[in-house]
Every structure is written in structure tokens, then in C-alpha cells.
Amino acid sequence: MLSIRTVLGPLAAILLTVIGPFGAHGSGLADKVMWAVNAGGESHVDVHGIHYRKDPLEGRVGRASDYGMKLPILRSNPEDQVLYQTERYNEDSFGYDIPIKEEGEYVIVLKFAEVYFAQSQQKVFDIRVNGHTVVKDLDIFDRVGHSTAHDEIIPISIKKGKLSVQGEVSTFTGKLSVEFVKGYYDNPKVCALYIMKGTADDVPQLQPHPGLEKKEEEEEEEEEEGSPSKKQSNKNRVQSGPRTPNPYASDNSSLMFPILVAFGVFIPTLFCLCRL
């Protein structure tokens, strides 16, 4: 019996060491979240233990849509696709007000997926936090494509009655206002959002997007190549169509024609006069 305990003791310690951090991370993350909403949908508990409440704007502002329920959402856990399949939109700007009593470091996590439009420049809008524009011209399809999860992560700091976000500072009176601002292209929207204490490093990352990573790598390669590639493309450029005729050459020919005609008439006339 003693030998079994001697073996199981260290084994249990190893298991707790390996499993412990994962269990603690899940429960710890949920404890850090102070406010979460499934916009346009019902309450939901995600794989991290975050409890999203039913949309408090239901019947008050904007419209709820579950159009995305018929589509699978890339980059999202299968259990949490509902967070990207429902949404709230409005024909004008709208938002959520979140009371915050304690000072400290916070993170706003906004969840989106484009489930309707299939090209860029169809739905574009801004996002403001207490009047500060934190996301400009958000085009979800342009960022990640169709029916694909996209998160906007916005760190903020509240200290000594001041809100700091992206280098801007304003007076904070205990209420955080997250606003989705109407633009020129369609209506602003959001699928889900939550506020948590901590930093951006504490936010769970979405699953990899192979197409998006390839696009970013190509953009980085183009930036590294710089001007030589542009020079080469200019060098290999083919002219489209024939050269444009010189307008001044045509003007000279048109001026010479009357002179030649006059000269041709003058010579025979002079010859006839001489014979007389």
C-alpha cells in the first residue's frame, strides 16, 4: 500500500500541475468579465465560461437578426457560433451603456461576422467609446471575408476619474458608452460584446484564418520589396493603343494647303497676261 501511495502521490501532483492552469484560466477569465451581451440573441455561456446575457436593447433600439443562423461561422468554436450568427443593427447610430465602478485596466471585446453582404464597401461604420473613435471605417467583409468571425479588441484605462483609450483622455463619470456609428454604407451592427478587467493579452484568440494569414504575408512581402517592384512593373508596362497624333503637325499641313493652291492659280494667270 505504501508503494502505491508513493507512486500515485507524485503522479497526482503532475496531473494537477498540467491540468490546473487550464482549468484556472477558464474560470479565471469568466471571473474577469463584468458585462457581456449576445446582441440580437438569447443568453449563452461560451467555452471559456463567459455568460452572455440576452440583449437588453430588445424592443427598444434597432432590430435583431438571426439571418446568420443558416451559416457556419469560420474561426469560431462550434459551440460559440451563435455569438456571431445573431446580431443587432440599426438604421442610425446606436450603442450600449455599461456602468463601471472600479478603476483599473479593462478590455472591450466586440464580435462581428458579415453574413449578408458578399463584397467590400457594402457595410462600413465607425465605433466610438465615450466619444473617442476607436475603430474607423470598419468593413467586416474587407477584413476577413464572408461568414467569418472577427473580433475588435480595445484596451482602455480608468484612473483618477479619467478614461484613456488609444492615446486620448477624457473625463470618466462611471459609465462606459460603446457606440456603433452610422456611415455612408448600410447600417452599423454588432454580434456580441463583453467588458473584462485585464489586458489584451488576456483575451482568447480566434482560430487561425489561413486565407487571412496568406494575405498578410503577401502584403508584408510587398512592403519589403518596396520601390524596386514598382519600377519593374512600370518597366514591363505595355502601352494600350497607338500613339496620339501630333496636333501641331496637322495644323502645319492645313496651313500649307491654301498657299499651294494660291500659288498654282497665280502662275497660269501670270503666263496668260505675259502673252497679251
From Swiss-Prot:
Gene3D superfamilies: Galactose-binding lectin. A carbohydrate binds at Y67, Y89, Y116, F117, D186. Residues 216-226 have a biased composition (Acidic residues). Glycans are attached at N252. Carbohydrate-binding protein with a strong ligand preference for Glc2-N-glycan. May play a role in the early steps of protein N-glycosylation. Can bind di- or higher oligomers but not monomers of glucose, including maltose, maltotriose, maltotetraose, maltoheptaose, nigerose, kojibose, cellobiose and isomaltose, although based on their subcellular locations, these are unlikely to all be physiological ligands. Its main location: endoplasmic reticulum. It holds the Pfam family Malectin. It is a single-pass type I membrane protein. The keyword Transcription does not apply. Keywords: Carbohydrate metabolism, Endoplasmic reticulum, Glycoprotein, Membrane, Signal, Transmembrane, Transmembrane helix. It is found in: Endoplasmic reticulum membrane. Residues 202-249 are annotated as: Disordered. Residues 229-249 have a biased composition (Polar residues). It comes from Xenopus laevis. The keyword Transmembrane applies. This is Malectin-B. Residues 27-253 are lumenal. GO terms for molecular function: carbohydrate binding. Belongs to the malectin family. One of its GO terms (cellular component) is membrane.
